[in-house]
Amino acid sequence: MENAKCYAPQILVGTEGLPREQWLEYRRKGIGGSDAAAVLGISPFRTGRDLYYDKLNIVTADDAENWVQLEVGTLLEPLVAKIFAHKTGYKIYRRPFMFQHPLYPWMLADLDYMAELPDGTTAILEIKTTNYNAKDNWWYNGEEIVPIYYESQGRHYMAVMNIDRVYFCCLYGNSEDEAMIRRIDRDMAYEEELIALERDFWENHVLTKTPPPYVEADGDLILESLRRKLGPADKDAPPVLLGQTQFGQLSMLLSLQEQKKALSADVSKLDKDIKRLKGMLIERMGTSCTAVYNGLAESYTITYNPVRSAGISKDALERLKDKHPDIYNQYVTVSEWRRFHVKKAALQAA
């Protein structure tokens, strides 16, 4: 990018005390750092189509589904920033503004913190929290990494702010030792490609109100996106006539189902063999919950512990509905899902 070192970010709006609804309205004026992964099709949280709907305020993400996770992240942000400052010795501070790229006004940045480095330069600091099991996303083959969906966020911010370094501090436990610090430096080739893809998303989809195609590899993410957009099924709607494009998709789907069916037969046989061997071991254990094998080269401990859970049978649920409808209606929720099924029609005689 020819003007990489010749610009300063513009301030779109001050965020100190800005009501959330107004903040969201300003975010819809462009693409933010946390939007970048969805534009690239690498977000584990939402699709590019979800982002498109959000920018046009058609369908927004349901924060109620993960409100605890969002609230924990917000509450812990100052603490994690303090941990970063303590570990590095860098001075950190906030700049409570939503920034805008002067050359690409649809590129926005709302930063967590800034860090003042010993050489007098400034870096961006992004705060993250995760659970213990997800900490492995910050490693690859024993090497420290930044997850690609967060990397795109950091590189977006570097482009907007014209800053050459981003630090991430991610807390996965309840002690200072369970905070990971990662650093990425500016990559102009990555940045140019990111800007081109974001420009295409903004100008050719958002501004023209043309939904982007689903390009994500995660089918569950796509189905959840469609569920939010489409809502309940309409049983009175006429059948939809599919064209050649959809026939190609259908043919591939049927082929994959056949492959899965063949593999499932092998899996089913393996499951039966595993259960047979498990039965032999359980027979030897009897009523004991533990068994031990002590060999010369290796040792094993088997546990077969009881697991109890509360539940209610379908028959009991029907009796509850009949005898105590007030209690039933208070605690039972009815959810709707749609079953996808393909049936090959018989060819009609000419």
Annotate the PLM regions.
Residues L103, S251, A262-A350:
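Extended, charge-rich alpha-helical segments
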Residues L70, H86-L111, A115-V206, K344:
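Nucleic-acid nuclease catalytic cores
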Residues R49-D54, A159, L254-Q257:
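Short, hydrophobic/amphipathic alpha-helical patches that form generic packing surfaces
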Residues K82, R155, L254:
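Short alpha-helical basic/polar micro-motif
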Residues A189-P238, G311-A350:
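Short, positively charged
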Residues T208-Y214, D220, R227-N294:
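Contiguous, amphipathic alpha-helical segments that mediate oligomerization or scaffolding
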Residues M1-I124, N131:
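Metal-dependent nuclease catalytic cores that hydrolyze phosphodiester bonds in DNA/RNA
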